[in-house]
């Protein structure tokens, strides 16, 4: 159960930014010896691995390898078998002009850190300037996804690109060239559903799109102005009768769509105002959604039709994680918000169990954006300036 305090078990410093992703890869590679981590937040998008990872590491301790990247990136690495895939970007000058912007996808050998291949995705059309909040995450924030044969990567206005495991480009599909009114850039990650690659292109075209895995052909497109500022990754709910729904959180609403057609099945009004950056969390037929700057969180039961605000909203709360997607574990939701406060809330009621400032996190600014993951019963949170924190879940 969740206790009314948090205690840091370990804190590990991060090496310079150009190598930071590779420390995560090292830990993630250990996690994935017994299981693949094929998408954002791993299997089922739950952020939980069964295997153990080290409690301590440094430049020399518990570090199997490190590999220099072409530039920074905010996406998570993914792992399939002996391959690690990670993205980054380069070519942004000191004035913030992205005219020479290049995105990169790397395939790295998990055992040695050797780069098997690297592919460059050149800028296609105008891109948002590197200024304001875009500097907080950059141009490589969308985690790739793989089905074990092909790796799919989303590069915002440069589109969705599919590569074979040998590095051959299979197809490339544009999903829009627009910008939101904030000009914050893209953040949502791809998910797979059957033969479809599903992309939240809210930033690029105020749409969610499904592409055919084999060809990149657009199968359906769901559009709506309400999608603006919806930066989270959609999720899939499997109902008790076997039917499935695609769910996504957006400002003031949660949507349930038919993943085969994109048709809107139901919607629920919420108090998730402002930008909505956290991704939905799915547990059985329950969807948990957290707001961004405006705050708020909500639990909604899937499976309804039409406006389900009065019938399917299970609870609402004023607390939020701002950017991070909380971790659901044994009936509790865990996260550290952007100000460095650790939270635990009841998944059944939304009631706050504890809120505590983490002393090891530097105050000021926004020190935490990363979503927590769990390995061997411990919670790992990567901070922006204070390394990686390891905390108990109980």
Where are these regions (language model features)?
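Noncatalytic, solvent-exposed loop/strand surfaces
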Residues: 29-394
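N-terminal secretory signal peptides that target proteins for export/translocation
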Residues: 1-15
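N-terminal hydrophobic alpha-helix used for membrane targeting or insertion
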Residues: 2, 22-24, 98
